[in-house]
Design a protein with these regions (language model features):
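Alpha-helical solenoid repeat architecture
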Residues: 17-31, 46-50, 60-74, 91-95, ...
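Short, intrinsically disordered, charge-balanced linker/junction segments flanking boundaries
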Residues: 172-178
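Alpha-solenoid helical repeat architecture
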Residues: 8-11, 51-54, 69, 96-99, ...
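Intrinsically disordered, low-complexity regulatory regions
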Residues: 1-25
């Protein structure tokens, strides 16, 4: 193939990788002004579609950036959960089914960040998160199990009803067996 044809595609991929890595780094920085600025720049709207990117590292960094932003700001977390009837949340759950352990760790961490907000936990749970987190407890990777258990714990901390849903999903058995 001609280099002139391949080059724009390689540049496009490099640009996406640089974008998600940079946003993730800015979101995770110590300066809360970055989070506010990223919120004003509507970073979540730009990161959401990258959760379906065929390049796993782009998908993983997008999830990392979204999780970091959602953990830092309840309004951003609300946007993730409520955007187009939970479109971003559904993308996260859908990609968990087929992803590698590195993405699963990042996605479980993101789900934990969303679940920490009391005002959003019930909506996160109604999106089917518990089923996916319980299935991650069966993963052979210890860190996937750890982040999944952490997310389930955050759900439980938001009320008796949610804790009961976690227990009813057989999560305790999976934790004990794991």
């Amino acid at each position: 193939m001609s280099r002139a044809v391949i080059q724009p595609f390689e540049e496009y991929q490099r640009s996406r990788i640089i974008f998600v890595q940079t946003v993730a780094a800015l979101a995770g920085g110590k300066d809360n002004r970055n989070v506010e600025l990223l919120k004003r720049l509507d970073a979540i709207r730009l990161l959401g579609p990258l959760l379906t990117d065929p390049v796993i590292s782009i998908k993983q960094y997008a999830a990392l950036a979204i999780g970091t932003l959602a953990g830092a700001d309840e309004e951003i977390a609300s946007q993730v959960v409520n955007d187009d009837n939970g479109h971003i949340l559904n993308l996260i759950l859908k990609s968990l089914e087929t992803s590698n352990r590195f993405y699963k760790k990042t996605a479980c961490r993101l789900l934990g960040k969303l679940s920490k907000w009391k005002s959003l936990a019930a909506k996160v749970v109604s999106g089917g998160v518990i089923t996916f987190l319980v299935s991650c407890l069966e993963d052979c990777d210890g860190e996937v199990k750890q982040f999944s258990a952490n997310a389930l714990q955050k759900i439980c901390m938001n009320g008796e009803d949610l804790a009961r849903e976690v227990i009813n999903a057989k999560s305790i058995e999976n934790l004990i067996e794991g």
